[in-house]
Amino acid sequence: MSAQNYHAGLHQSSTQRPPKRPNTEHAQEPPKRALIGGQTTPSSSGGGQTPNGTNYELEVKQQLSNYQKLFDQATYPFIRDVSTYEKLNKIGQGTFGEVFKARCKNTGRMVALKKILMENEKEGFPITALREVKMLEQLKHPNITDLIEVCSAKSTGTTGSKDRATFYLVMALCAHDLAGLLSNPKIRMSLVHIKTMMKHLMSGLNKLHRSKILHRDMKAANVLISKDGILKLADFGLARPFVQRENGAGPRPLYTNRVVTLWYRPPELLLGDRQYGTKIDVWGAGCIMAEMWTRQPIMQGDTEQKQLQLISGLCGSINKDVWPNCVNMPLWSAMSSEPNSALPQGKYRILPNKMKNLMKFDAPDSKTDPFGKNVKQHDSATDDDALHLLEILLAIDPDKRPTSDEAEDDIWFFKDPVPMANVQDLMDTIPNSQFEYTVGKGAHANRGRHQNAQQRPNQQQARPSNAIPAGQYRDTIF
């Protein structure tokens, strides 16, 4: 039946039988959605060809190239060009970009420029960088790094080259990072310095968690110290908001498991947990606290299996007695299988004995040294309160670790010597920036007994790397 007869039938008496539906078996498909340039996508039976006979995959690649060209040539009227700043030297490598020391040409202010790596991005501005910008704008706190502005640099090369449009996060410049500071044997820290920096660390982490944000890459290299002695959490490239369930009700959300640099990764992540919470950051804070005394990462594994073995060797065997929920972890069976189990049994917790010999300090003289600035390490009483805090921060069972709020209010911070407002007196004794020490001399590469390094996150995979350079490292506990 033709369309003309069909429409004519609509005007006939309603008592007549309605016309049959038109036969659509061989009807022409409606036109597909147009791509840029007015051409249409192929039908499912078109064998990968567009109506004009061109290859569809090539067509899509061309359109993506057009999109990238538009992105590279775009102007951003509400952000300044990075030429406002003069780059001086490279001072670090973050999770998702390089970091440069720079000077504002207009004001002379020294800043840090964090370049957002765009070489492997095919869909414009990376979502991880958008997250970082949004969170830093939200997190205004003395112990969290400051975001000043976002700048851009126009593309200087052809589309598809590495010189495409680039963006920079302009941050307040800090004089040192904690990894570089701890790697320099000439820098001596007193108990009050350690206590002050740990107070700052817990305060910043508590602000993060109260704002419903997970850092997910706690390590000494991501802790900065300003020239006036204020410690600041930095590098939010892996951070993300989290959902806090009311009274534990409702399903627990799933997050990506491949987060946190290996040496600071807690046992639940190593066992495949994807329903983790703030306690993964608390474990990292515990690793950093121990590092204040050991001056090197305390558990240096080169694989996830070796890292679990080192945790068991230092903190005791992982089993249902110390962590009832461990057998429910996704990788429990795989990691505990013989003959090369990553979860050795019969291991005792030796962390207290290893640390108590390092945590011995004189009590400060209340008359000549009321703030404990000149407290020295030697054979006197162990700081039991510090040891207790470290013990619970590094609890195998995440439910037995304190929250960052509880850790910030731990009794250790209220015992003499109490934390100071800052560690500027320590900063005044350090002539050169420890970023230069870290980047220029390879402080991370010189940490530990075996001339290895704190691993850097894998830039292309956008997650912490498990890879340790072959031949440079052997698994070790401090």
UniProtKB/Swiss-Prot annotation:
Keywords: ATP-binding, Kinase, Nucleotide-binding, Nucleus, Serine/threonine-protein kinase, Transcription, Transcription regulation, Transferase. It is found in: Nucleus. Residues 1-17 have a biased composition (Polar residues). Residues 451-464 have a biased composition (Low complexity). Residues 85-413 form the Protein kinase domain. It catalyses: L-seryl-[protein] + ATP = O-phospho-L-seryl-[protein] + ADP + H(+); L-threonyl-[protein] + ATP = O-phospho-L-threonyl-[protein] + ADP + H(+); [DNA-directed RNA polymerase] + ATP = phospho-[DNA-directed RNA polymerase] + ADP + H(+). Residues 1-55, 444-478 are annotated as: Disordered. GO terms for biological process: embryo development ending in birth or egg hatching; germ cell development; nematode larval development; positive regulation of transcription elongation by RNA polymerase II. One of its GO terms (molecular function) is cyclin-dependent protein serine/threonine kinase activity. Associates with cyclin-T (cit-1.1 or cit-1.2) to form P-TEFb. Belongs to the protein kinase superfamily. CMGC Ser/Thr protein kinase family. CDC2/CDKX subfamily. Essential member of the cyclin-dependent kinase pair (CDK9/cyclin-T) complex, also called positive transcription elongation factor B (P-TEFb), which is proposed to facilitate the transition from abortive to production elongation by phosphorylating the CTD (C-terminal domain) of the large subunit of RNA polymerase II (RNAP II) and spt-5. This is Probable cyclin-dependent kinase 9. It comes from Caenorhabditis elegans.
